[in-house]
A protein has these predicted regions:
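Classic N-terminal secretory signal peptides
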Residues: 1-22
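Cleaved targeting-peptide boundary
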Residues: 20-30
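Short, non-transmembrane alpha-helical segments in secretory-pathway proteins
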Residues: 30-54
């Protein structure tokens, strides 16, 4: 019974950490004005050119957030610089 409680507590803790990371990068990806940003479609195209299968994308807090599948089919969240499409972070 004690093992079940420990495993449950560990899983709950891990779920909280991954949920907190998935919300946002916590810092802007660029300081450039929005007039210099690429369109959301252009950001998605750049991610797809790198082998990602884009499922959803949005612009948030001066970052492009792209939810995609990598070449192995694993879910990933990409944070991209909206001025260039360069990947700044991957979770």
């Amino acid at each position: 019974m004690n093992k079940i409680a420990i495993i449950t507590a560990a899983l709950v803790g891990l779920a909280g950490v991954s949920g907190a990371q998935a919300n946002s990068l916590g810092r802007p990806c660029t300081s450039a004005p929005e007039s210099q940003w690429l369109s959301l479609e252009a950001l998605k195209t750049k991610a797809e050119a790198q082998g990602y299968k884009v499922q959803k994308a949005k612009l948030s807090a001066a970052c492009g957030e792209i939810y995609a599948l990598d070449h192995n089919g694993a879910r990933t969240e990409l944070f991209v610089d909206p001025t260039s499409g360069d990947i700044v972070a991957k979770m």
